[in-house]
Amino acid sequence: MEFYASLKSIAMHVPSERVKNAEFQQFLDTSDEWIEKRTGIKERRFANDEEKSSDLGVIAAKQAIERAHLTPKDIDLVVVATLSPDFLAMPSTACVLSAKLGIENKPAFDISAACTGFIYLLSVAKAYVESGMYENVLIVGAEKTSSVLDFKDRGTCILFGDGAGACVIGRTKRLKESILDVQISANGNFSNYLYTPRTLKPTPFNAKEEASEPFLCMKGNEVFKLAVKTLLKDVEMILEKNALKPEDVRLFIPHQANFRIIQAVREHLDFKDEQVVLTVHKYGNTSAASIPMAMGEAYEEGRLKKGDLMLLDAFGGGLTWGSALVYFGGS
């Protein structure tokens, strides 16, 4: 191979509005203590009514492009992962975001893999770059999850937040600046564990019931058990496949869904506290945006430096899951 795919830059963005746990007490039978004990979440950010996922994503994307020492015209492909797209079916959020960046006549499409979206993005970008088809790929996890939440359901609405993370994937000749490995998987037999109901209305010729509200639905206990079991196996597999041990990893950056899930994986693999990046306490579950947001924060805090090896993992609706070993190739 003449070159490898490399994560050249990372940036994140969150809306300004902080929503603390106690604020849910206004309309739900819950409390700050109840939420934090079960999830590790203390607060999250919610976008305003005018903001869409693409608006959050474009801010992160502009910074990622700048940090890669590129301009929007240098981007060959844009791929967005989101479960809260700007439009129901079309156009894709990637197309909308591309236009806001001033990118024209370049391919753009969305990926639907829920909370595993960013791992899927890495897999797609790695394949395109290493095939030689594209040189610079912009990948964005952007979520306005607040737009798909039922605020009468305390089992879901307390968990999520809004935000975005973006990366530029380019080329390198150095293995230790590359996206070393990505593995993704899915099992649709559990699709009813975590889903957003169909919102298209039936025709007047055979209408029997009203269309479902487009709110996120989740079987929390079942998802928790499957997530822990699946992620433990998946992370062990990718480390073993690459002849690596937990101590070889500079940063473990899991999907920020629930502190208890993260802690179960961390303890099983014996990661030290300084290896683990946690943002769930202040941003909640931002779905496809959570991993790039956590990466972006680690970079801005000086914890992530060029050549550092990251282990990423995620689990989400589909059900989908995946993990990645990524050297940071930026500066």
Curated annotation (Swiss-Prot):
It is found in: Cytoplasm. HAMAP family: FabH. Catalyzes the condensation reaction of fatty acid synthesis by the addition to an acyl acceptor of two carbons from malonyl-ACP. Catalyzes the first condensation reaction which initiates fatty acid synthesis and may therefore play a role in governing the total rate of fatty acid production. Possesses both acetoacetyl-ACP synthase and acetyl transacylase activities. Its substrate specificity determines the biosynthesis of branched-chain and/or straight-chain of fatty acids. Belongs to the thiolase-like superfamily. FabH family. Its EC number is 2.3.1.180. Keywords: Acyltransferase, Cytoplasm, Fatty acid biosynthesis, Fatty acid metabolism, Lipid biosynthesis, Lipid metabolism, Multifunctional enzyme, Transferase. InterPro entries: ACP_syn_III_C, ACP_syn_III_N, FabH, Thiolase-like. This is Beta-ketoacyl-[acyl-carrier-protein] synthase III. One of its GO terms (biological process) is fatty acid biosynthetic process. The last Arg residue of the ACP-binding site is essential for the weak association between ACP/AcpP and FabH. NCBIfam families: fabH (TIGR00747), PRK09352.1 (NF006829). It comes from the Bacteria.
